[in-house]
Amino acid sequence: MAATAARRFLTSFADMMHATPSAWHLLTIALISAVGGAINAIAGGGTLLTFPTLLGLGVPAVAANATSTVALWPGSFASLMGYRRELDGIERWAAHLAVPSLLGGLGGAGLLLVTPEERFRAIVPWLVLGATMLFALQGPVMRWLRGRTHADPEHAAPRALSPSLGMLVSQFCVGVYGGYFGAGAGIVMLGVFRLMGLTNIHQMNGLKNINGLCFNGIAAASFAIMGLVNWPIALVMAIGSSAGGHTMARVAQRVPQAWVRHAVTAIGLASATWLAVSR
């Protein structure tokens, strides 16, 4: 098994070096990633723009998914830092949920690694469609959550309590999805946390960010070790999405979030349709 993994790594790395994208492709990816970063900053859903773009530029589906995961992972730190204070008092929750997140992310990454390219490409339209539906439902779900959550310390998670076995299993399942594809995992986590009994929306966002960092991080490491990452594209995407999140978001914030959500939903539906008819 180790020899097979080593051969796959060397073969994939060599193929990736021969498949270095052109300057025009890199420029396109940088621009799309910047827009995706801005969308993530104000509404989420940037993956629904960047992932189909990589496919449209000829990047294999599995490599596109792996590259996106690696490229977008550093941005998770910024989100986590913004909510780090909200984890005060729920360190036990964070520590316990991190374990199934890591295991789930590893399982999801492993599942992707053993999925043949043809089969993954066949289910990609459904993954994009499902993620688009999750994104479209984000507004109603967040309104439902806000109606049942609070932002004050009185409604913080009890310090003495820990997640139940059912909660850990639920987070493991979210981690598997996050490691395998991941788009829309954030809104799924918020819903799961609410069902777990958490009522402080800021704490829920903090837990969402740290757990996303866990399952995306271990998945990214797995993809990198197995040689599935197109590093020139990953670097350009990381720079572009970071720039978009910090600069373009200032401009995009002048646009109502509802407009951005409708646009991303339309892009997701169009991408799913295109992926279905073009494969």
Which residues does each predicted region cover?
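Residues within membrane-spanning alpha-helices of integral membrane proteins
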Residues: L26, T69, V124-V128, T132, ...
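Selected transmembrane alpha-helices and immediately adjacent juxtamembrane segments
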Residues: F9-V62, R146-N205, L235
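Selective hydrophobic functional segments
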Residues: T67-W126, N216-A263
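Transmembrane helix exit motif
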Residues: A78-D88, A109, W126-A156, A270-R279
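Transmembrane helix-loop junction
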Residues: G56-L57, L113, A122, R194-L195, ...
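Alpha-helical transmembrane segments of multipass membrane proteins
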Residues: A34-A38, T53, L80, L106-G110, ...
